[in-house]
Structure formats: structure tokens, C-alpha cells
Swiss-Prot record:
One of its GO terms (biological process) is translation. Keywords: Ribonucleoprotein, Ribosomal protein, RNA-binding, rRNA-binding, tRNA-binding. This is Large ribosomal subunit protein uL16. One of its GO terms (molecular function) is structural constituent of ribosome. SUPFAM superfamilies: Ribosomal protein L16p/L10e. It comes from the Bacteria. Binds 23S rRNA and is also seen to make contacts with the A and possibly P site tRNAs. NCBIfam families: rplP_bact. One of its GO terms (cellular component) is cytosolic large ribosomal subunit. Part of the 50S ribosomal subunit.
Amino acid sequence: MLQPKRTKFRKQMTGHNRGLAHRGSKVSFGEYALKATSRGRLTARQIESARRALTRHVKRGGKIWIRVFPDKPVTKKPLEVRMGKGKGGVEYWVAQIQPGKVLYEIEGVSEELAREAFALAAAKLPLATSFVKRTVM
């Protein structure tokens, strides 16, 4: 599972997930990409699950890049614990996603295979996504 090796602070405030993705919105590494068209949070488990779906579908052909990293901790208090007594412990890590963010990239496979693989990966994600091609090689 993806998570930071070390952070400056153990816990973060919830914050807001506003705006559009300007950084990380272009296809930089591969030929085809899966781009988010809605906003939300991707957990480390969801990112890994979609990655597995991609790699299993393309088998040995092609190279895959993961363009998102879960760097935000989400805390949760234990069950049946009264309010107060501080913030809960870190439960899992998320990546905050804005519309326009490239999530995965792939190269070395046909467009048809890439579309099929991204469709399988998109089914694992809680976001609306679209298939994009690299414009300038």
C-alpha cells in the first residue's frame, strides 16, 4: 500500500477539496491515460486495486505509471468512544483528486487494450474518469 515514509506532522486538518487540477493534468510519461473528471478522495487501497486490475489486464506488455500518491492522513476514533479526548488515530491515507488530474498512464500497448484496461481500473475507483491520449509525442 502507498503511504509516506515520514511526515512533518502525524495528523492533518480535513480541509477543502476545491478547484481544478492544473498540475498533473497532462499526459507526461505514457501514451494513454486515465483522467479524473470529478472530484473526490482516493484511498491507498483503491489506488492499489485499480493498479492490479491494470497490470493483470495488460499482462507483461506495456509500462504503467501511477500519477497520484496518498499523502493525506484520515483519522478515525474507535467505535463506542465518547466525543472529546482528542483526535483519533490515523486510519488510512488518501490522495485528494480534482477534476483534470491524470491518475494512471500506460504505454507499449494498443489503444484498444489500453481502453479495456482503463475501463476495468475505472470500475474500482469512486470517481468519474475519462480516457485520454497524448497529443504531442
